[in-house]
Amino acid sequence: SGKGKGEKCTSACRSEPCQCGSKCQCGEGCTCAACKTCNCTSDGCKCGKECTGPDSCKCGSSCSCK
């Protein structure tokens, strides 16, 4: 049981659907992503500017707002 990609979301993660780092991104099929460039919070995804929520956040090699 590690923190790799594909890990199922915990209930705590489901309550905060847009998180980055070693945490889950429940908005992306409940998988964990090694997203280091954005700062996602339960209030939405902050990618240098605020996005409207998990669905407007796209985390990858670079972070952007859809």
From Swiss-Prot:
<keyword id="KW-0480">Metal-thiolate cluster</keyword>
<feature type="binding site">
    <location>
        <position position="45"/>
    </location>
    <ligand>
        <name>Cd(2+) 5</name>
    </ligand>
</feature>
<dbReference type="InterPro" id="IPR001008">
    <property type="entry name" value="Metalthion_mollusc"/>
</dbReference>
<protein>
    <recommendedName>
        <fullName>Cadmium-metallothionein</fullName>
    </recommendedName>
</protein>
<feature type="binding site">
    <location>
        <position position="65"/>
    </location>
    <ligand>
        <name>Cd(2+) 6</name>
    </ligand>
</feature>
<keyword id="KW-0007">Acetylation</keyword>
<feature type="binding site">
    <location>
        <position position="13"/>
    </location>
    <ligand>
        <name>Cd(2+) 2</name>
    </ligand>
</feature>
<keyword id="KW-0479">Metal-binding</keyword>
<feature type="binding site">
    <location>
        <position position="65"/>
    </location>
    <ligand>
        <name>Cd(2+) 4</name>
    </ligand>
</feature>
<feature type="binding site">
    <location>
        <position position="59"/>
    </location>
    <ligand>
        <name>Cd(2+) 6</name>
    </ligand>
</feature>
<feature type="binding site">
    <location>
        <position position="40"/>
    </location>
    <ligand>
        <name>Cd(2+) 5</name>
    </ligand>
</feature>
<feature type="binding site">
    <location>
        <position position="47"/>
    </location>
    <ligand>
        <name>Cd(2+) 6</name>
    </ligand>
</feature>
<feature type="binding site">
    <location>
        <position position="26"/>
    </location>
    <ligand>
        <name>Cd(2+) 1</name>
    </ligand>
</feature>
<dbReference type="GO" id="GO:0046872">
    <property type="term" value="F:metal ion binding"/>
</dbReference>
<feature type="binding site">
    <location>
        <position position="51"/>
    </location>
    <ligand>
        <name>Cd(2+) 4</name>
    </ligand>
</feature>
<feature type="binding site">
    <location>
        <position position="26"/>
    </location>
    <ligand>
        <name>Cd(2+) 3</name>
    </ligand>
</feature>
<feature type="binding site">
    <location>
        <position position="35"/>
    </location>
    <ligand>
        <name>Cd(2+) 3</name>
    </ligand>
</feature>
<feature type="binding site">
    <location>
        <position position="35"/>
    </location>
    <ligand>
        <name>Cd(2+) 2</name>
    </ligand>
</feature>
<feature type="binding site">
    <location>
        <position position="20"/>
    </location>
    <ligand>
        <name>Cd(2+) 3</name>
    </ligand>
</feature>
<feature type="binding site">
    <location>
        <position position="63"/>
    </location>
    <ligand>
        <name>Cd(2+) 6</name>
    </ligand>
</feature>
<feature type="binding site">
    <location>
        <position position="9"/>
    </location>
    <ligand>
        <name>Cd(2+) 1</name>
    </ligand>
</feature>
<feature type="binding site">
    <location>
        <position position="47"/>
    </location>
    <ligand>
        <name>Cd(2+) 5</name>
    </ligand>
</feature>
<feature type="binding site">
    <location>
        <position position="32"/>
    </location>
    <ligand>
        <name>Cd(2+) 2</name>
    </ligand>
</feature>
<feature type="binding site">
    <location>
        <position position="38"/>
    </location>
    <ligand>
        <name>Cd(2+) 4</name>
    </ligand>
</feature>
<feature type="binding site">
    <location>
        <position position="24"/>
    </location>
    <ligand>
        <name>Cd(2+) 3</name>
    </ligand>
</feature>
<feature type="binding site">
    <location>
        <position position="30"/>
    </location>
    <ligand>
        <name>Cd(2+) 1</name>
    </ligand>
</feature>
<comment type="similarity">
    <text>Belongs to the metallothionein superfamily. Type 2 family.</text>
</comment>
<feature type="binding site">
    <location>
        <position position="51"/>
    </location>
    <ligand>
        <name>Cd(2+) 5</name>
    </ligand>
</feature>
<feature type="binding site">
    <location>
        <position position="18"/>
    </location>
    <ligand>
        <name>Cd(2+) 2</name>
    </ligand>
</feature>
<feature type="binding site">
    <location>
        <position position="13"/>
    </location>
    <ligand>
        <name>Cd(2+) 1</name>
    </ligand>
</feature>
<comment type="function">
    <text>The metallothioneins are involved in the cellular sequestration of toxic metal ions and regulation of essential trace elements. Binds almost exclusively cadmium.</text>
</comment>
<feature type="binding site">
    <location>
        <position position="57"/>
    </location>
    <ligand>
        <name>Cd(2+) 4</name>
    </ligand>
</feature>
<keyword id="KW-0104">Cadmium</keyword>
<feature type="modified residue" description="N-acetylserine">
    <location>
        <position position="1"/>
    </location>
</feature>
